[in-house]
Amino acid sequence: MISIGCPPLSLLPFEEALQMVDGRFEGWEIIAEGKHLLPAIKEELEEAISSHRMKFTIHAPLSDINIGSLNPGIRKEVLDQLVEVVMIAHQLGVERVTMHPGFLSPITFSRRELAVAAVRDSVEEIERRTKGSGVLKCIENMPVSFMTLFTEPEEILDLTDGTSFMLCLDVGHANTTGNLPEYLQHWRRFGSVHVHDNRGRADEHLPTGEGDIDFRMVLDKLKDFKGDFVIESRSVEEGLASRKYIESLNMTAP
């Protein structure tokens, strides 16, 4: 299944964004921020789920959301929001929520291990508070940046070991960190795959085919993967261009 995840859509009223996506993709990964904060659109989303054949999944809020924060008050608010998203997804029958694994802040730039420990505690708390929800929770690998955590396969796999969390492989992010082939070896641990392109130096979110990622190789390595492919794009039009490129490879994403 090919879905779209398009952050700019979260700045539009939900119904307007839905009309832009409906009938053009099999699924929509809603970015739950801006005008699409899940508590605010819960009723509209429930109606959309019941009246559309499209599959809906959720990308948890990411702006200002840091599960690696050392500030107890901020971290509590972040965890409360993420747990709320998972539980609303459970109530609506949405099967998957994707989250980011936090980032460094001024206090942890020189003590990275403190942020990593906070992330581990956060994952354990989310796991405990959402136990029994039945919602698939995925942690996404991050791109190259002076602020990012969990860019290496062994780090994020170790983070999710012993939990119900799976990995959301972000192909573009892995290209910037130079370890896409290593990530692809662990495809059985993937709950979903994010698709966009870049030239290996920055997280550009280009349409597929405009960067240097070998998507023929990626699709071949993922030929037995049964989860969703989510095209992350800067606009619906670029998302459609990415889909057309993938289909032109004469290889069908699951």
What are these regions (language model features)?
Residues P7-L9, I30-K35, P61-S63, G102-L104, ...:
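Active-site beta-loop-alpha junctions enriched in small/polar residues
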Residues P72-M166:
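Active-site acidic/histidine proton-transfer and metal-coordination neighborhood
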Residues D64-L70, S105-S110, G200-L206:
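A short acidic, helix-capping loop that chelates divalent metal ions and anchors anionic groups
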Residues M1-S3, L12-Q19, E95, L149-L157, ...:
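Histidine-acidic metal/acid-base catalytic patches
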Residues M1-E84, H90, M166, T252-P254:
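N-terminal pre-domain/capping segments
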Residues G27, T57, C138-I139, C168, ...:
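Generic enzyme active-site microenvironment
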Residues P13, L37-I41, E77-Q81, A115-S122, ...:
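Soluble or luminal CAZymes and related metallo-dependent hydrolases
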Residues A17-G23, P39-T57, V86-G93, E127-G132, ...:
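Acidic (Asp/Glu)-rich catalytic clusters
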